[in-house]
Amino acid sequence: MSDHFPDVSKIEFEGPGSDNPLAFRHYNPDELVAGKSMKDHLRFGAAYWHCMRNPLGDPFGAGTAHMPWDDGSESLDNALARVPVFFEFLEKSQID
């Protein structure tokens, strides 16, 4: 796995008492609900453009999102550079 988010480990369930901002407090992927795991009930997804290309601009100004993996071009090299970053994001977020 690449290391584009070195200060972020895989996000885990820590329970409602956790003060970790990067922890699941109520979502426990392995907990059974009505005979089925939460992971199977709640199939999370991530939209590629919103995660990897959205500069967070609005009608009041240009975007402020800092994405060091993106050089701002529409080149194939730039597109290919984003792929491992997105997969790392998915893995650390536990999105299958």
State each model region's role.
Residues 1-96:
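N-terminal pre-domain/capping segments
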